[in-house]
Amino acid sequence: MLSALCLLTAASAFAQESAPETVVIQALDGNRESIELTVPYDPQRIAILDMASLDILMALGLEDRVVGSASSSLEYVQSVVTAEGVANLGTIKTADMEAVMACEPDIIFIGGRLSGSYDTLSEIAPVVYLPTTDEGTLAQTRLNADTIASIFGKEAEVAALFEGFDARIETLKSFADGKTAIVGLVTSGGFNVLGNDGRCSIIGREVGFTNVGVDAEIDTATHGNEASFEFIVEKAPEYIFVMDRDAAIQTEGAKLAQEIMENELVMTTDAYKNGNIVYLAHPAVWYTAEGGITALDIMLQDLEAELLQ
């Protein structure tokens, strides 16, 4: 009995000695340049200013370490962001710096909207800023999950979290093969075209619709390029995918995307006549949480419900 206890004690001591104090990961700096970032290994106090990162942390079972979080309307993160003892750190666009400092985090996760605050936040704790679409949505989400898991010694748990995603995308690809589309977001009464390099790029990049709205001369990565409805008529896509930004950010008094899109011009298109205008059912997920595992599942569900039923 005594020898068994000694062995357990020795094993525990060895594990503690072999665990590193820090780990080096690939991340982005405030200029969106790739850097090697040293962060504490297995940090106990996490500040969340990015919902995709929170999504991955929850999938890894680390939500109990969150000491502060930005607010969010996403239903699946409410158990964390509104939990007792979790400080409100502002929003994913504007952080409450005093609140972040007060919660004494060991590590801070941010998204692109806070890249301008990277240096200020880095004075509080190491800031992990990960890309969301550089490698394609699925590949980048998987890569980010691997990165986050490596910080906490949970690398072995990642593969199981992505089971089934490849097959689902292949099914959608079979449907999309040879079909044309325009992808865009509705905001402030207008329609902005999105390319294959940012938001909603999974539709053209991985699912495989030919995105006829892509134009190398314009920046389509963030809010897209404002397009006239004549542009849609001219391009004559078979499908039109619409993300309602105003609904995503809960803009008061904004018109619904359907009211804006279904006008005299758009109603002349085959996409409208054939019932192929797809309004993405969970715009807040597409707009604020792309890059998370649950978010990816919901995004695929939105496409499957419209295209495969």
Predicted regions and their residues:
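Short, low-complexity disordered leader/linker segments with a strong preference
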Residues: 1-41
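Structured C-terminal subdomain patch of bacterial secreted/periplasmic proteins
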Residues: 25, 45, 140, 176, ...
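Short helix-initiation/N-cap motifs at beta->coil->alpha
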Residues: 28-34, 89-97, 218-227
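A short, structured surface patch at a secondary-structure boundary
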Residues: 45-99, 113
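Basic- and aromatic-lined ligand-binding clefts that recognize polyanionic substrates
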Residues: 45-57, 157-214, 222
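Proline-aspartate-enriched helix->loop->beta-strand connector
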Residues: 97, 101-110, 126, 232, ...
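Extracytoplasmic substrate-binding proteins
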Residues: 119-189, 276, 285-309
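Ligand-binding pocket segment of bilobal, Venus flytrap-like solute-binding proteins
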Residues: 221-249
